[in-house]
Amino acid sequence: EEVVVIATPKENRKLRELPAATTVLSQKDMQANQVNSVKRLSGLIPNIFIPEYGSKLTTSIYIRGIGSRINTPAIGLYVDNIPYIDKSAFDFNYSDIERIDVLRGPQGTLYGRNTMGGLIKVHTKSPFTYQGTDIRMGAATYNDYNVSLTHYHRISDQFAFSTGGFYEHTGGFYQNSARNNERVDKGNAGGGRFRGIYLPKDNLKLDLNVSYEYSDQGGYPYFYTGITQEGINKGKTEEREEMIGKIAYNDRSNYYRNLLNAGFNVEYQAKNFILSAVTGYQHLKDRMF
């Protein structure tokens, strides 16, 4: 029987003993289902729904029907024990992920704000556990491709680090007839991650995690559907019949995002208790036009 143990500053119990509805996705599960972002969790985990709105600006997560389309999210997201507060930061690259834990139901007692509906905890790979270099490449129709490279190195029994980067390109599907059928929803993204773990003593751990990601996405693949039924009832006639079903914009529409995340975790294990201090910093600068 496989036993999965959840070990965080909040709890250290076997998963089956937790008084909560939980789901764990291992690295093998994520590879088999091509989970490369949080939006791919829809359909894999019970009671969770993440609609695809197009850009990374809005990543609304619903668990058991509880969620938020705008403003403050109702589902929390933690990455290596660091909370991600804004929904615009939820959709990032998952090339260096070891495990995903999903806790359904209110988690505010332990995790505070933004966890009324549930919590998603993402764990990156530890350089003490994984060694070597991980290279991934992928390609798909409509000129979609991606590549990532991560190196894990254990220098000694006290220090190990991992560093890597990724790049992905989406060729787009919808065409803009006003710009010579240019793909309106194409996009590019790239970034990197560094993690260093230092064990100065047997009972003391210092864990630093820094990641950066830049995204440039096309957007607004909307088209004219014709006059509404309300307009027809008022006696109006269709004046733009030739534009029905066509995407036609004079200018490009884009969403730019710069996302920097940093977290530092200090954990001290005493004889009868564990003392943990987690500090996080997030810088999000984006623009949609």
Put a short name on every predicted segment.
Residues 3-33, 59-60, 75:
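N-terminal periplasmic "start-of-domain" segments of outer-membrane beta-barrel proteins
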Residues 22, 39-82, 98:
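Extracytoplasmic beta-strand/coil segments of soluble accessory domains associated
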Residues 22, 30, 41-42, 100-105, ...:
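Non-catalytic regulatory/gating segments with a bias toward low-complexity or hydrophobic composition
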Residues 41, 103, 123, 136, ...:
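Transmembrane beta-barrel domains of outer membrane proteins
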Residues 59, 73, 86, 95-98, ...:
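Outer-membrane beta-barrel translocator/receptor signature
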Residues 80-106:
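Short acidic/polar hinge/loop motifs at secondary-structure boundaries
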Residues 87, 188-191, 197-199, 209, ...:
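Outer-membrane beta-barrel transmembrane strands
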Residues 129-130, 138, 153-240, 247-249, ...:
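Periplasmic-side early beta-strands and strand-to-turn transitions of outer-membrane beta-barrels
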